[in-house]
Amino acid sequence: FITCTPLNKAELIKIVPFLLNRTSKEQASEFSVSFYAMNGDKAIRYVYSVLLETTHIVRETLIYYLSQQPATVFERSMENNVSSIKFGQKVKISTAAKEEITLKCLPNMSVFAAYMQVNTNIAEMETALQYLTKQMMPAIVPTSSLSRYAEEAIKKETAKEYILRYLQEADFNISNISSKEQETKKGVVNYTMYQHKVSSGLGGNDYYEFPELYESDGTIRTFGLASQIQNSIGSNAFLAVDEIESSLH
């Protein structure tokens, strides 16, 4: 949505409202994300918010915090079925650029999408746009396959340490995870082995290794989820997880 440019102002916005009551589908949907982006050696907090219906954007704002008080980058609303955009006092932008962005901003597109079509540079918008387009990871849903990425992640020692710690804190008795290769007629196949630590009953511990086939869905799901969370932290990225409890113990 952020960078999507519709063919015309009649094109519908692809949103699905909450449907489990009688009123929500008749109301506008709202989305807001708060994030930190670097400005030199200082992390600046930004908040992007949008209120929209399938036909048009009702309200859209971008604010940031250079101090404890928020400052406006832009504020967009609808006036007589036409987009109206106001830029903050601290934003450096020419009158001509303001007018061009407003003219290009159809009712069913974001201010960012209109901005990207104009030959101008607004530092605050560039910073926010970079984060929203480069550091918003694909959402994880119950049908998302996470194992392949996790199998690659554990080849890196730092990622492996984090994933193991995550699994252990989730009360799994997994003491090690290793990625292995096997030659087959179809080529090299990668697979993951899980090492479990079990009390021997004699004051010591026994260790058993099992392939993924013998692990529960909860273990596999947590393994994949841990790798994605580690990636989001390392990349300072935003990660949305739908039904996080799905298949977890």
Cite the ranges covered by each PLM segment.
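Electropositive, glycine-dotted interaction segments
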Residues: 41-183
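A generic structural signal for beta-strand entry/edge sites
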Residues: 28-30, 82, 187-191
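Short, well-ordered loop/turn elements at secondary-structure boundaries
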Residues: 27-28, 171-173, 234-235
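Short, glycine/acidic-rich beta->alpha junctions
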Residues: 25-27, 42, 159, 221, ...
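Short acidic, glycine-rich loop/turn motifs
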Residues: 33-41, 64, 196-203
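Conserved P-loop NTP-binding catalytic core
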Residues: 1-54
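Short, solvent-exposed loop/turn elements at beta->coil junctions and helix N-caps
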Residues: 17-21, 180-185
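Conserved ABC ATPase signature
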Residues: 186-249
